[in-house]
Amino acid sequence: MTEGEIPWGPTGELVYNRTYSRVKPDGTRETWPETVERVVSGNLALVDSRYQLPGEREDLLRLMREFKILPAGRHLWASGVKNAQHLFNCWVSGWTEKPSDHFEFTFMRLMEGGGVGANYSNRFLADYPHVKQELEVHIVCDEDHDDYADLAEAGQLSSRYDSDWVDAFVIEDSREGWAAALVDLIDTHYRDDVAHKERVYDVSRVRAAGRKLKTFGGTASGPVPLAKMLTEVSEILSRCAREGEQYRFEDGGALTGLDAMEIDHAIAQCVVAGGVRRSARMAMMHWADWQVETFTNIKQDSGSHWTTNISVEVDDAFWSLAKAPVDPLNPRSTKAHRVLKALSEGAVRNGEPGMWDSSLSNVGEPNEVVCTNPCGEITLEPWEPCNLGHINLAAFVTDAGKTDYIDLIRAHRLMTRFLIRATFSAVADPKSREVLDRNRRIGVGHLGVASYLALTGRRYSQAPGDKRFTAFLREMAAEVDRAAEEFSHELRIPVPVKKRTVAPTGTIAKMPGVSEGIHPIFSRYFIRRIRFSVLDNDQFLTASQYAADGYHVEKDQYDKSGNTWVVEIPTKDTLVEAVAARFGRDAEDIVESANELTLHQLLAFQALYQTCWADNAVSFTANVDPDAYEGVDVAADLQRFSGLIKGSTIFPEESFPQAPYERITKQQYEAAAIKAVADGVDEECANGACPIK
């Protein structure tokens, strides 16, 4: 690589321009070196310059320009942006004594482009008062509004009120304004006395669909999705009140975990209507909860809840019961076995629900963690954000197939310091500020791991038994811990409660073109699908160019607004060629793809990283052939690795239409009549969960 040359992966520049390159004041877009300069400057400015190491700025610039270190996408998008340095990708929304707090927090974080996890176990909602009021939402709008006709066509405009109604709740054109309307509606449902059961909301001030959103990117969705959301939320809460009447409760009916999950889905649908991948969620429920068996099948049975991943919370008690023979006289024993059956059969059916082990996850935590972020790599307290950065191991392999240890150690230490500085970034909610200051949690992760192993002549399946590699991981973990302790003591702040993780890194790994996270390459040949928002002019033009070039382009069937297109790109992985250049004919033996590995081998690799590297969690998707595995096979492996992994996502290939990737043969690839783009990593998270930024 010549000086100044950017080591893009085959589609890296496309992904960078679509996702992270900001528009400058003169109307042109940032180049990668300009983005790096902004990101590093913004990060260093969070802490007084006297705490910088000699040469730290120059090292950060170099390592990031060369894709040797890469902070999470939100840092790349927002770091160094004046008055908009929102650096945290994902959060967990908790539960307070006020029901609307949870939904307001979820709505705000999703509108900021973040992902939100929540635990819907009914123990968290048990102390809530009953929903007391049945209400009816009426939407009004000025007839001169650009979207007035769309509101009318969608059936959202009131036939009883208009925008001159003086008692209407006027919704301001801001995230806070939208959230205030939601809070008003929810709080009204809980009031003892309400004078007017018909709640009128005026959307005249909400900007029209398609307008640019400057701070977080994307485009405005207009008032229609907001109107639909308010109506749906009111219908859910009114149903709760009616059910209370049915059971002769004098003060209404209870909000259940599944009701709350339905409200969050309505909120997320409203947000995602504004453009591609602006909503990502994780929904969890405890295995012993009275609603869990409905929860495990809720996406399949309802055809809804497409805005979230779902996982069952298990614990030591669950594994103790599930590993023992079923006791038909013990209701907890029979339930544990039913839940394990649902987990294992769901895995080979459609990949859901996943599993999260709360007992293992809470080891070493000062306070209870209740859920993970949507991709599952960070377990969090209520209101806590995740704060991620990654080391690209593959970038430290020399031309001779050796590891540049000096620069690699430097990278681990500098990324640790980068993320600790980020904990000083502003957050919008004081509940988040409190837990962030107390925990200072960071997540230094690895990407390009499969690429690193292959480029150093090692097979992926043999890594768990490779003592050199396990020692290497422990050594790098120790470097992170030392750097965190030293820097935290200098800054007079608590040492981060946990420091190391593995994230999917789908979009991030796309830029240098290496394997994402710790996943093996998907296949030597496959179809990769990229999503584009047609509301964003640049993305629309790019997708249109793909169509003109002969690529297959169709609407995203999961985005009901019709605002997202899916482009299919036949893809050849480049790792085999790179390894062949170093090791000759052995490349085919060295490079292993996911379909050549057993579920046991995949989970063993996850367990390796969980035990030797991560004190947080490891986000990992084990893709399996549904024809080769039955539920009992999955159950056996889950039991075998219980206590070693904090969560699991086991995913059957081709389990849903428009999957991010689909394996094809070499012959199918060569038969494609279009120019293929060479690369081996998925552009989204491995489980399709992460936000676009």
From Swiss-Prot:
Gene3D superfamilies with a match to the protein in the record: 3.20.70.20, b-12 dependent (class ii) ribonucleotide reductase, Chain A, Domain 2, b-12 dependent (class ii) ribonucleotide reductase, chain A, domain 3
GO biological process, one term: DNA replication
Record: active site: 375, 377
Cofactor(s) named in the record: adenosylcob(III)alamin
Record has Oxidoreductase as a keyword: yes
InterPro entries the record matches: RdRp_reductase_class-2, RNR-II_ins_dom, RNR_alpha_hel, RNR_lg_C, RTP_Rdtase_AdoCbl-dep
Reactions catalysed: a 2'-deoxyribonucleoside 5'-triphosphate + [thioredoxin]-disulfide + H2O = a ribonucleoside 5'-triphosphate + [thioredoxin]-dithiol
A Pfam family assignment: RNR-II_ins_dom
EC number: 1.17.4.2
Assigned keywords, A-Z: Cobalamin, Cobalt, Disulfide bond, DNA replication, Oxidoreductase, Redox-active center
Keyword Protein biosynthesis listed: no
GO molecular function: cobalamin binding; nucleotide binding; ribonucleoside-diphosphate reductase activity, thioredoxin disulfide as acceptor; ribonucleoside-triphosphate reductase (thioredoxin) activity
Cysteine-cysteine disulfides: 90-386
Family per record: Belongs to the class II ribonucleoside-triphosphate reductase family.
The name this protein goes by in its record: Putative adenosylcobalamin-dependent ribonucleoside-triphosphate reductase
Species: Mycobacterium phage D29 (Mycobacteriophage D29)
